């Protein structure tokens, strides 16, 4: 592909790579070449990430561990900057776009030192530490949710969080028809969460028999928790599909009337774009309390209830489920509120900001394939 090159910088986890993938697709439709610089974890996505080339640079997380471990992380970041400097001099990208996490620091810092245009995307409702370090050094900042930061206001644009193609497709699915079944999706993140395995089955087992007989549960469960979770659902005569990973999770979300989940940026953004009611349990003890900030955005719309993990008990959840599952019109109303807050075209908004920052006029946009 000829034309300008955009270099994306993202850590090798789904929370960083999903929005980077969505932007890569949006840029490709505009005739823009995309390459990815990341860490070794992202190599497993090499066959699916829409970039013409992938590059790795050393990176580390200097915020935890012993003094020796933190020192080693800083050294790795330093080596990463040197490697990124060589890479950017060779590639000469029109702009470098970072998606957070410490693996994005070397490429963005190197681009800033070389005077290359830079864009930083913050997915969460509060800026993470790596992004805070980079914020004053970049030319433009895109935010998934509104950020309350007067110092950054001049360079800040709320684009929303770019959605992966499967989530965009799910956003077009209709709300589940009322057929007597009660559809519940339970997910705890890319690897599942033990708290969901500990709390949700016990809460469901305590529901009245009439509700249990109508429930259809899809639950993401860690392999080591699978047997005990299945045993509880079987004992309660509840239909449940369990897996450690669902490749079609956005579609499963669209099929549900209620979702119980953590509050990562991708989860909250997909809940809003698809439009589903939710009970959110933010990950506790996070340094930046990013999930609590994300959950607050959806709570403010009236689409979600937010529960602290310490209050997330079988007794509490069983009571909330009994009330919510007995009032399907309320769940539908909450879904509509979520949908109204969704930003389905976030990838297009971010693509336009990226190209404006680069000073590039894009070619005609090809239709999205979802």
Segments (PLM) and residue ranges:
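Acidic donor-binding loop of glycosyltransferase active sites
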Residues: 93-95, 254-269, 276-277
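C-terminal alpha-helical cap of glycosyltransferases
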Residues: 323, 343-370
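An aromatic- and histidine-rich active-site surface loop
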Residues: 41-45, 95-114
């Amino acid at each position: 592909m000829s034309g300008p090159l955009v270099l994306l910088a993202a850590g090798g986890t789904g929370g960083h790579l999903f929005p980077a993938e969505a932007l890569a697709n949006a840029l490709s439709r505009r005739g823009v070449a995309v390459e990815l610089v990341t860490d070794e974890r992202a190599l497993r996505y090499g066959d699916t990430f829409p970039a013409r080339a992938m590059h790795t640079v050393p990176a580390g997380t200097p915020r935890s561990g012993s003094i020796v471990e933190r020192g080693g992380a800083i050294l790795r970041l330093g080596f990463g900057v040197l490697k990124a400097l060589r890479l950017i001099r060779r590639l000469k990208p029109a702009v470098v776009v970072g998606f957070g996490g410490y693996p994005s620091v070397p490429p963005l810092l190197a681009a800033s030192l070389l005077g290359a245009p830079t864009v930083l995307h913050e997915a969460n409702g509060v800026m993470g530490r790596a992004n805070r370090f980079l914020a004053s050094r970049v030319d433009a900042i895109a935010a998934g949710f509104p950020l309350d930061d007067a110092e950054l206001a001049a360079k800040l644009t709320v684009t929303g969080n770019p959605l992966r193609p499967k989530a965009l497709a799910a956003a077009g699915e209709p709300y589940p028809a009322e057929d007597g079944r009660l559809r519940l999706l339970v997910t705890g993140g890319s690897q599942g969460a033990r708290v969901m395995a500990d709390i949700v089955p016990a809460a469901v087992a305590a529901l009245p028999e009439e509700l249990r007989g109508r429930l259809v549960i899809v639950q993401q469960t860690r392999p080591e928790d699978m047997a005990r979770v299945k045993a509880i659902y079987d004992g309660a005569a509840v239909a449940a599909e369990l897996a450690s990973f669902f490749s079609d999770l956005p579609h499963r979300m669209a099929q549900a009337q209620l979702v119980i989940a953590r509050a990562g940026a991708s989860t909250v953004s997909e809940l809003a774009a698809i439009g589903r009611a939710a009970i959110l349990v933010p990950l506790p003890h996070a340094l930046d309390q990013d999930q609590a900030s994300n959950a607050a955005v959806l709570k403010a719309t009236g689409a979600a209830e937010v529960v602290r993990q310490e209050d997330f008990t079988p007794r509490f959840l069983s009571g909330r489920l009994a009330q919510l599952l007995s009032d399907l019109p309320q769940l539908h109303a909450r879904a509509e509120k979520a949908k109204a807050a969704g930003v389905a075209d976030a990838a297009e908004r971010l693509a336009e900001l990226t190209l404006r920052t680069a000073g590039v006029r894009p070619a005609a946009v090809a239709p999205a394939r979802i």
